[in-house]
């Protein structure tokens, strides 16, 4: 539901309120359905016939050795991969029943529904408050009270509010690496996405900060669908519900994380997770 706020000059701004989250009963709901997805960088065939169903309110881990297509696949889910001039894509990626590769699907709409957290924390050279308020402002929200509510809610959602509530107007660069990454997660939450993509979100962090992010992911999956690329096998086993193993641009195996790590059906999966290669 939206709240209409009258600002100066009697201009009405429609402020998005947190969308009601529904408990999924019975069969899980599909967030993304990827069918026969192929992707080329020039002549390099980077993704080959990818078929995956990714479910809502779960953590899905994408694992595999460097260069296997993990991050490329992740970036197809919000069409960031299209920023590469030589890229060519075929197949279908359905998000909640709509093909996001259809040119009629507006990228701006997609990216308000699908947030992304990158490998290295990338706060803007602004205050902590302005980092989180940036997205809502882009979408037309100017009312200070509403912005303050969004900022607090997002920082609480990213489990960093208590650490920064007295320094909201300090530069975000003054935060530690782990705090910066949680700030970036808060910035992502501020636009109320349905899906959060995470590309190696803890690889640049120390073990203590990594643990905080992992605990946060477990909380966030109650409200959001999370897809995480990771090289860390132990991390994938700890935090994910399902795991897809990529190799040479193909999905070798996709199943519940318990099965992937305890009883994989493909020897290549077993060899990878036990460290025989990769």
Curated annotation (Swiss-Prot):
UniProt xrefs under PROSITE patterns: ABC_TRANSPORTER_1, ABC_TRANSPORTER_2, PSTB
Gene Ontology molecular function, alphabetical? ATP binding; ATP hydrolysis activity; ATPase-coupled phosphate ion transmembrane transporter activity
| GO cellular component terms given for this protein | plasma membrane
Which segments constitute the ABC transporter domain?
Answer: 32-273
**Binding, ATP:** 64-71
SMART domains (alphabetical)? AAA (SM00382)
A Gene Ontology annotation in the biological process aspect, one of them, is: phosphate ion transmembrane transport
Q: What is its main location?
A: membrane
Tell me the compartments it is located in. Answer: Cell membrane
Q: Which SUPFAM superfamilies has this protein been placed in?
A: P-loop containing nucleoside triphosphate hydrolases
Recorded hits in InterPro entries, A to Z, give: AAA+_ATPase, ABC_transporter-like_ATP-bd, ABC_transporter-like_CS, P-loop_NTPase, PstB-like
ATP-binding recorded as keyword: yes
Q: What is its EC number?
A: 7.3.2.1
Keyword terms, alphabetized = ATP-binding, Cell membrane, Membrane, Nucleotide-binding, Phosphate transport, Translocase, Transport
Pfam entry (one): ABC_tran
Catalyses which reaction(s): phosphate(out) + ATP + H2O = ADP + 2 phosphate(in) + H(+)
Superkingdom field: Bacteria
User: Membrane topology type, per the record?
Assistant: Peripheral membrane protein
Transmembrane segments annotated in the record for this chain: none
Keyword Transferase in annotation: no
> Could you describe the subunit structure of this protein?
The complex is composed of two ATP-binding proteins (PstB), two transmembrane proteins (PstC and PstA) and a solute-binding protein (PstS).
Q: Could you say which protein family the record assigns here?
A: Belongs to the ABC transporter superfamily. Phosphate importer (TC 3.A.1.7) family.
Protein known as: Phosphate import ATP-binding protein PstB
Q: Which organism is it from?
A: Halalkalibacterium halodurans (strain ATCC BAA-125 / DSM 18197 / FERM 7344 / JCM 9153 / C-125) (Bacillus halodurans)
């Amino acid at each position: 539901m939206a709240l209409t706020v009258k600002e100066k000059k009697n201009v009405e701004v429609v402020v998005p309120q947190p969308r009601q989250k529904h408990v999924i009963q019975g069969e899980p709901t599909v967030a993304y359905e990827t069918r026969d997805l192929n992707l080329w960088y020039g002549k390099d065939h980077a993704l080959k016939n990818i078929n995956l169903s990714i479910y809502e309110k779960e953590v899905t881990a994408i694992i595999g050795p460097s260069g296997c297509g993990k991050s490329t696949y992740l970036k197809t889910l919000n069409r960031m991969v299209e920023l590469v001039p030589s890229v060519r894509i075929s197949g279908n990626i359905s998000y909640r029943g709509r093909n996001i590769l259809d040119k009629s699907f507006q990228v701006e709409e997609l990216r308000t529904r699908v947030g992304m957290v990158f490998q290295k924390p990338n706060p803007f050279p602004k205050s902590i408050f302005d980092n989180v308020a940036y997205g809502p402002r882009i979408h037309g929200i100017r009312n200070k009270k509403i912005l303050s509510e969004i900022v607090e809610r997002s920082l609480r959602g990213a489990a960093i509010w208590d650490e920064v509530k007295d320094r909201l107007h300090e530069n975000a660069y003054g935060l530690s690496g782990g705090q910066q990454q949680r700030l970036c997660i808060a910035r992502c939450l501020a636009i109320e996405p349905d899906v959060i993509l995470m590309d190696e979100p803890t690889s640049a962090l120390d073990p203590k900060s990594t643990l905080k992010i992992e605990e946060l992911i477990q909380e966030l999956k109650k409200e959001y669908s999370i897809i995480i690329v990771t090289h860390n096998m132990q991390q994938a086993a700890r935090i994910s519900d399902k795991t897809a193993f990529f190799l040479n641009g193909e999905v070798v195996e996709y199943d519940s994380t318990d099965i992937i790590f305890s009883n994989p059906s493909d020897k290549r999966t077993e060899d990878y997770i036990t460290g025989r290669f990769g």
